[in-house]
Amino acid sequence: MTDKEQVVIYTDGACKGNPGRGGWGALLLYKGAERELWGGEPDTTNNRMELMAAIQALAALKRSCPIRLVTDSEYVMRGITEWLPNWKKRGWKTASKQPVKNADLWQALDEQVARHQVEWQWVRGHTGDPGNERADQLANRGVAELPR
């Protein structure tokens, strides 16, 4: 499938302190059009912001569609492609019977993914990928715009 036929989404999270003030950002591209999304939370973690970026980007789409979602988060990538099916089978417990961290957001992401046909792609962060760099800027904007 070409990028002209699917929505391409770049997501990123940022945190000043972990936990600390955090932001998430997403860049959505479709047929030459762009949409930027960002937000933040005063007390959060980087992993939660990475998840929020993906959740908010997918939730922003009004109807089911094919998507290529690009993330630099190994946590999100491995969680959605490797760990999630087993967490669900175990009632949101890890292999060591511990509650899954950020289960609320993993469940929200799972709900959003079910609405679409998502192809996941991992990229190394901060290596000059234009979409990833834009998502990073948006995530940092999410932090910067939090009230002090």
Curated annotation (Swiss-Prot):
The gene is rnhA. Its main location: cytoplasm. GO terms for biological process: DNA replication, removal of RNA primer. The lineage of its organism: Bacteria, Pseudomonadati, Pseudomonadota, Gammaproteobacteria, Pseudomonadales. This is Ribonuclease H. Belongs to the RNase H family. Keywords: Cytoplasm, Endonuclease, Hydrolase, Magnesium, Metal-binding, Nuclease. Transmembrane segments: none annotated. CDD domains: RNase_HI_prokaryote_like. Endonuclease that specifically degrades the RNA of RNA-DNA hybrids.
